[in-house]
C-alpha cells in the first residue's frame, strides 16, 4: 500500500555540471570572515617528542648556574663535574646525551622487552604500566607478605618522588618542591618488572630492607644534600624575595586589586593616599607595605628610597625594625620575634600588663637596670703622683730671636764643682804625671834608638844654651805655683796659650829642686787643669787659693826680662825655693781627660766686649839647668813632637778680662761646651797659628816657628821616616842655638814648612798631594776619633750644661748613658753624682714614629722636660687568688721559713745596689734620689720620654740638653745682619767634630 502511494521522481536528462548558477551565487555572496573558520577548525595535536623542549636554568645537582650539559630526554641539566660519573669536555658525546636516570630507564625498558619476547608476553611488556592489582596477583604466587609490604612502600616512595617532576605535571619548575625533586620520574619501576617470569630473581632482591633503597638511590641523578621543608625557614622576613603568581609568569590578564591596576603605581578611584603626606599617587608613585595596608611615597620615607624595593618591604610603622635591629641575633631568634609581633596587639592588653607590673609588691625576678656609665680611662698612679708631688719648675731660659741666651757666670748651685773637694789629690796627680812621663820617655827612646843618627847626639852635647821663645796669649789667664804651698806676695797677670805643654813648665824649674818635688808640683798643675776650667766664658771666677791651685795676678805685662816671669815688674830669685813657676794650661792628654774643661767660645752681646784675639808678647823662659834628671830632661826633647800631635787638638780658651765685681752680661751661646780642642775659630787661627816672617838676617826664632807652625801640621805615624827626620832636625837646631838659619835647614823641612803655610792660608781649596810628603795619617787617638766623626754624620748632639766634659754626637740610632766604661756617654766625665747608675738610660730613634725617645733603666729615675721617668716599685697583685689548698701550703712554707730565720744567727743581708759599698760617699748636689718623688704607692712611669730639639734632661744632678742637628743647622731669619758683622765666618769655621749651634725656633 505504501509502495503505491510513493510518488515517482521525474528524472530529466539534463547536464547540470556546466551550469552558471554556482558561479553567480559565489559572486553575489557577501564576504566571509576567517573567525568562523578558526573557531571551527580544531588544533592539530602535535606528536609528542622524545625529549623536552626546554631544560632547567640551574644545575639539578648543586642548584647553581653556569655552563650546563642538558639531557636530550628530560629537562635535567648538570655541570660537567656534577654528572655521574664526572665528565670533561673531551668526553662529551657527539650526538644525543642522556643523564644517568634516563640511561637506567632505557636499559630497564630493553630488558623488559627481551623478557617479554621470551615468555610470549610481548603485548604486556609493550604497556607502560600495569595495574596494581595485577602486580599483586603475580606477587602472591611467588612472594610472601613481607615482600609485598616492601614493594608497596617502595611504590609509595616512587610516586612521592615523581609527582612534581613528571612530564605531564603542569606545576612550575620554580616551586620549592620542584627544586628538590624536579626530574624524578619513575625511579623504581617495580610495575614494569616481570615478577612472575622470574620468581627466583625477585626473592633474593628483597631479602634485606635497605636493598630496595640502595637500588633506588643508584638509579637517581646525583643531588646535593638539602634540608626538608620542615627544617627550612618559611618565615617571610623583610628583604626576602616575593613569589610570583602564575598569572604574572604566564602573562595572562587577571583582575588585580584596586591599588595594583597600574604598573607605574598610579591608583584610580577609590584613591589611595600616602600615610605621611596624605597625597595621592599623582605626586609620585606609591609603595605598598607587604605587611600592612599602608602606602608611602619614596621621598616621604626616612631615609628616602632611591628605587622601588624588589623584595618584601616593611614600612617604618612596624616595631620589628627596633627589635630586629640587633647585630648578634640568630635567624631562629629573628623568626620568633617576627612571629610574635606579626599579629596586631590589643591596646587593652598593653594597659593591663603595665598595671600588673606596677602593682607587684614582690616580683619574682626584679632586675635592677644599671645606669650606663661613661667610658673612662684609668689614670696610672705615676701620673697621679706627678700632680701630687710636682717637681720644681725649670728656670725659664731667655729666648730671643730664636737663640738661646744664657749667663756666663755659673750659678750658686754649680759653684760646688769648683771647690777643692772635687779636685784630684796629690797622690793622684803624682801618679798621673809619672805615668805620662814614663810613656813619653819610652816612646822617645824607642824612636831614637832605631832611626836617629849618632852625630845628632854628639852635636846635642856640644850645645849648651837653649833660648826658646814662646808666643803667649794674653787672653788666657793662668796662675803661678809655689813649692811651699804659699802664694807670693806680688800678683802678676800671666797669659799662657793652650799650646804650652808640660815640658815648658818643667824646663823652668830651679837647679836645686828635686825630681820628686818637680813631679808633684807639675802634676798638681796638670790635674788642676783637668778639674777646674782654665778660664770661664764671661770672666774669671774667684776661687780659693791653695798651694797647688790657681793664682790670679793683676800687674800689667810690660817687662820682658828673662829673669822675670812674663809681664812681671818684680824680679824673682832664681835659686829661691819660693820662686813661682808658670803653670801649664793643659797636659798633653787633656783632650781626652774626663773632667777637663776649656773655655767656651761665646759671642757677647755688648759691642764693647772683650776681644777674642788679644795681642801677643814674647816671653823668654830660663834655660834648662844641667841638674835636671834625664827623665824630665828627655821630655823637652819631645816638645816638637807633642806640639804637632797635642797642640793641634787643644784650642786656646777665650776669657773675659773684666774685673770680678762687674755684673755678668748675658751672652748668646754659639757653641756648646766642648772638649779640649774644640772652639778654634778660623778668624783667630790665621792670627795665632801663622808662621812669622823671617828677620832681616834670615833667622827665625825656634819657639815661634815650632809653636806657630806646628798647630796645623798634618800628623804622621810615629814610625814614619819623614816624621823622625823632621823631629830630629828641628830638635837639633833648636837645642844648639836660640835661632835657626834657613840656609842650614834641610830641603825637605823647608818644603814641609812651606806646604804647611799654604794649608793655613787656603785650608779648603788646596789639598796636600799624597806623594809629596807621605801618607796623611794621624798619630794620636783623638785625631782618629775626629776622622771617624767626619765620616759618620751626627744625628743629634748631647750637650752638658754644667761646663764639664764635652758634647757627644749621636751618630747612630742608639746612645747609651751611664757611668759604665762601655757607655756612649760616660757620666763620670761630667761631674760626680751619687744617684746615677752604670746603665742609666738609652736614647734611641724610632723609625716608625720618626722621633727620638729616651728609655730609663735606673732606679733613681730620669727627668725629661720636668717630667720624671722612673721604675714601677708598686706591689703587683696576683690576677686570681690561689685556691684554699694552695694558700694553706704557702702559709705553711712561710711559717717554716720564718722559723728557720729565727733559729739562724742574724747576719746582715746583702743587697744589690747601684751605690758604692764601703767608704763614705762623696756629697753631690742632689738632696735625695728622684725616685723619692714618686709617692707612697711607688708606681713610677716606665714609658718612654719623647725628645724634641732642646729637650732638658736631668740625670741626678747632671744636666744636659738634647739637640737635633736638622733643626740646629737651620739658620734663623736674622742671619742677614750677622753676615755684615762677620759672625757667619765664625760659624762656618767650626770644626767637623764640633756640635751644631743650639739655635732653633722649636726650643721648648
From Swiss-Prot:
SUPFAM superfamilies documented for this protein: FYVE/PHD zinc finger, SMAD/FHA domain
Molecular-function GO term, any one: zinc ion binding
Pfam families, sorted: PHD, PHF12_MRG_bd
Main localization category: nucleus
PTM annotation (Phosphothreonine): residues: 557, 570, 671
Alphabetized UniProt keyword annotations: Isopeptide bond, Metal-binding, Nucleus, Phosphoprotein, Repeat, Repressor, Transcription, Transcription regulation, Ubl conjugation, Zinc, Zinc-finger
Taxonomic superkingdom: Eukaryota
UniProt subcellular location: Nucleus
Region (PBR): 105-128
GO BP annotations listed: negative regulation of DNA-templated transcription; negative regulation of transcription by RNA polymerase II
PROSITE patterns documented for this protein: FHA_DOMAIN, ZF_PHD_1, ZF_PHD_2
Residue segments, region Disordered: 28-59, 113-142, 154-187, 234-257, 530-580, 641-673, 895-923
Region described as SIN3 interacting domain 1: spans on this chain: 202-241
PANTHER family per the UniProt record, alphabetical: PHD FINGER PROTEIN 12
Domain notes: In the context of the SIN3B complex, the PHD-type 1 Zinc finger delivers the H3 substrate to the HDAC active site. The atypical PHD-type 2 Zinc finger has a structural role raher than a substrate recruitment role, wedged betweem SIN3B amd the HDAC and stabilizing the SIN3B:HDAC2 interaction. Also interacts with SIN3B through the SIN3 interacting domain 2 (SID2). Interacts with MORF4L1 through PHD-type 1 in a SIN3 interacting domain 1 (SID1)-dependent manner. The polybasic region (PBR) is responsive to the binding to phosphoinositides (PtdInsPs).
Protein name listed in UniProt: PHD finger protein 12
Species: Homo sapiens (Human)
Amino acid at each position: 500500500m505504501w509502495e503505491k502511494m510513493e510518488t515517482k521522481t521525474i528524472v530529466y536528462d539534463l547536464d547540470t555540471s556546466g551550469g552558471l548558477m554556482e558561479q553567480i551565487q559565489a559572486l553575489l555572496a557577501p564576504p566571509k570572515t576567517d573567525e568562523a573558520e578558526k573557531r571551527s577548525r580544531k588544533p592539530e595535536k602535535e606528536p609528542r617528542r622524545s625529549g623536552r623542549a626546554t631544560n632547567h636554568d640551574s644545575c639539578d645537582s648543586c642548584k647553581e648556574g653556569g655552563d650546563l650539559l642538558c639531557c636530550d630526554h628530560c629537562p635535567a641539566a648538570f655541570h660537567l663535574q656534577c654528572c655521574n660519573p664526572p665528565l670533561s669536555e673531551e668526553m662529551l658525546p657527539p650526538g644525543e646525551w642522556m643523564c644517568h636516570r634516563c640511561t637506567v630507564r632505557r636499559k630497564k625498558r630493553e630488558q623488559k622487552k627481551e623478557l617479554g619476547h621470551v615468555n610470549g608476553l610481548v603485548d604486556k611488556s609493550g604497556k607502560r604500566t600495569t595495574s596494581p592489582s595485577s602486580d599483586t596477583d603475580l606477587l602472591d604466587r611467588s612472594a610472601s607478605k613481607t615482600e609485598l609490604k616492601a614493594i608497596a612502600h617502595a611504590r609509595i616512595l616512587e610516586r612521592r618522588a615523581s609527582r612534581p617532576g613528571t612530564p605531564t605535571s603542569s606545576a612550575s619548575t620554580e616551586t620549592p618542591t620542584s627544586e628538590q625533586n624536579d626530574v624524578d620520574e619513575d625511579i623504581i619501576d617495580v610495575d614494569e618488572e616481570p615478577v612472575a617470569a622470574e620468581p627466583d630473581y625477585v626473592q633474593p632482591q628483597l631479602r634485606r630492607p635497605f636493598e630496595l633503597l640502595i637500588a633506588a638511590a643508584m638509579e637517581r641523578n646525583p643531588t646535593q644534600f638539602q634540608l626538608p621543608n620542615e627544617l627550612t625557614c618559611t618565615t617571610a622576613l623583610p628583604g626576602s624575595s616575593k613569589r610570583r603568581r602564575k598569572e604574572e609568569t604566564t602573562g595572562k590578564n587577571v583582575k588585580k586589586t584596586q591599588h595594583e591596576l597600574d604598573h607605574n603605581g598610579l591608583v584610580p578611584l577609590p584613591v589611595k593616599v600616602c600615610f605621611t603626606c596624605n597625597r595621592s599617587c599623582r605626586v609620585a608613585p606609591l609603595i605598598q607595605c607587604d605587611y600592612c595596608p599602608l602606602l608611602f611615597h619614596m621621598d616621604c620615607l626616612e631615609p628616602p628610597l632611591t628605587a622601588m624595593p624588589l623584595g618584601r618591604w616593611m614600612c617604618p610603622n612596624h616595631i620589628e625594625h627596633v627589635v630586629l635591629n640587633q647585630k648578634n641575633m640568630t635567624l631562629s631568634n629573628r623568626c620568633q620575634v617576627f612571629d610574635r609581633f606579626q599579629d596586631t596587639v590589643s591596646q587593652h592588653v598593653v594597659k593591663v600588663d603595665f598595671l600588673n607590673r606596677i602593682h607587684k609588691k614582690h616580683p619574682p625576678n626584679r632586675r635592677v637596670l644599671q645606669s650606663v656609665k661613661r667610658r673612662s680611662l684609668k689614670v696610672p698612679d705615676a701620673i697621679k703622683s706627678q700632680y701630687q708631688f710636682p717637681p720644681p719648675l725649670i728656670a725659664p731660659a731667655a729666648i730671643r730671636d730664636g737663640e738661646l741666651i744664657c749667663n756666663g757666670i755659673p750659678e750658686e748651685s754649680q759653684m760646688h764643682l769648683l771647690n777643692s773637694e772635687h779636685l784630684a789629690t796629690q797622690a793622684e796627680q803624682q801618679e798621673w804625671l809619672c805615668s805620662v812621663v814614663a810613656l813619653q820617655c819610652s816612646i822617645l827612646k824607642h824612636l831614637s834608638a832605631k832611626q836617629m843618627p849618632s852625630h845628632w847626639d854628639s852635636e846635642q852635647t856640644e850645645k849648651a844654651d837653649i833660648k826658646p821663645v814662646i808666643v803667649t796669649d794674653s787672653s788666657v789667664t793662668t796662675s803661678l805655683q809655689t813649692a811651699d804651698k804659699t802664694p807670693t806676695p806680688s800678683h802678676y797677670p800671666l797669659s799662657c796659650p793652650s799650646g804650652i805643654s808640660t815640658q815648658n813648665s818643667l824646663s823652668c824649674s830651679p837647679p836645686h829642686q828635686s825630681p820628686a818635688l818637680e813631679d808633684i808640683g807639675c802634676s798638681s798643675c796638670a790635674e788642676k787643669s783637668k778639674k777646674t776650667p782654665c778660664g770661664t766664658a764671661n770672666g774669671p771666677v774667684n776661687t780659693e787659693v791653695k798651694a797647688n791651685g790657681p793664682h790670679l795676678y793683676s800687674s800689667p805685662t810690660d817687662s820682658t826680662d828673662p829673669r822675670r816671669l812674663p809681664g812681671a815688674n818684680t824680679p824673682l830669685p832664681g835659686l829661691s825655693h819660693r820662686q813661682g813657676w808658670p803653670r801649664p794650661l793643659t797636659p798633653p792628654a787633656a783632650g781626652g781627660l774626663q773632667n777637663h774643661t776649656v773655655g767656651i767660645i761665646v759671642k757677647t752681646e755688648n759691642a764693647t766686649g772683650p776681644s777674642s784675639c788679644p795681642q801677643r808678647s814674647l816671653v823668654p823662659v830660663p834655660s834648662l839647668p844641667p841638674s835636671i834628671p834625664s827623665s824630665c830632661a828627655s821630655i823637652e826633647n819631645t816638645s816638637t813632637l807633642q806640639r804637632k800631635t797635642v797642640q793641634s787638638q787643644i784650642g786656646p780658651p777665650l776669657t773675659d778680662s773684666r774685673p770680678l765685681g762687674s755684673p755678668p752680661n748675658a751672652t748668646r751661646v754659639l757653641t756648646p761646651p766642648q772638649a779640649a780642642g774644640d772652639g778654634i775659630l778660623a778668624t783667630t787661627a790665621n792670627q795665632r797659628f801663622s808662621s812669622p816672617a823671617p828677620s832681616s838676617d834670615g833667622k827665625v826664632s825656634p819657639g815661634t816657628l815650632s809653636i806657630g807652625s806646628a798647630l796645623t801640621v798634618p800628623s804622621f805615624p810615629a814610625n814614619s821616616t819623614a816624621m823622625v827626620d823632621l823631629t830630629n832636625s828641628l830638635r837639633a837646631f833648636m837645642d844648639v842655638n836660640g835661632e835657626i838659619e834657613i840656609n842650614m835647614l834641610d830641603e825637605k823641612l823647608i818644603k814641609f814648612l812651606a806646604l804647611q803655610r799654604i794649608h793655613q792660608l787656603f785650608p779648603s781649596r788646596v789639598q796636600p798631594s799624597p806623594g809629596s810628603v807621605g801618607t796623611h795619617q794621624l798619630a794620636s787617638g783623638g785625631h782618629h776619633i775626629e776622622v771617624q766623626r767626619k765620616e759618620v754624620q751626627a744625628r743629634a748632639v748631647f750637650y752638658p750644661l754644667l761646663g764639664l766634659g764635652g758634647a757627644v754626637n749621636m751618630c747612630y740610632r742608639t746612645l747609651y748613658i751611664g757611668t759604665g766604661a762601655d757607655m756612649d756617654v760616660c757620666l763620670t766625665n761630667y761631674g760626680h753624682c751619687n744617684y746615677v747608675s752604670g746603665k742609666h738610660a738609652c736614647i734611641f730613634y724610632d723609625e716608625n714614629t720618626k722621633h727620638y725617645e729616651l728609655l730609663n733603666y735606673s732606679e733613681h729615675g730620669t727627668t725629661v722636660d720636668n717630667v720624671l721617668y722612673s721604675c714601677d716599685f708598686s706591689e703587683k697583685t696576683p690576677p686570681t687568688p690561689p685556691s684554699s689548698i694552695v694558700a694553706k701550703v704557702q702559709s705553711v712554707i712561710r711559717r717554716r721559713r720564718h722559723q728557720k730565720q729565727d733559729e739562724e744567727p742574724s747576719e746582715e743581708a746583702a743587697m744589690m745596689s747601684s751605690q758604692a759599698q764601703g767608704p763614705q760617699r762623696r756629697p753631690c748636689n742632689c738632696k735625695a734620689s728622684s725616685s723619692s718623688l714618686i709617692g707612697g704607692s711607688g708606681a713610677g712611669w716606665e714609658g718612654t720620654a719623647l725628645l724634641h730639639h732642646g729637650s732638658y734632661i736631668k740625670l741626678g744632678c747632671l744636666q744636659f740638653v738634647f739637640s737635633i742637628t736638622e733643626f740646629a743647622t737651620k739658620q734663623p731669619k736674622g742671619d742677614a745682619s750677622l753676615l755684615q758683622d762677620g759672625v757667619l765666618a765664625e760659624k762656618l769655621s767650626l770644626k767637623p767634630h764640633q756640635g751644631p749651634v743650639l739655635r732653633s725656633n722649636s726650643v721648648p
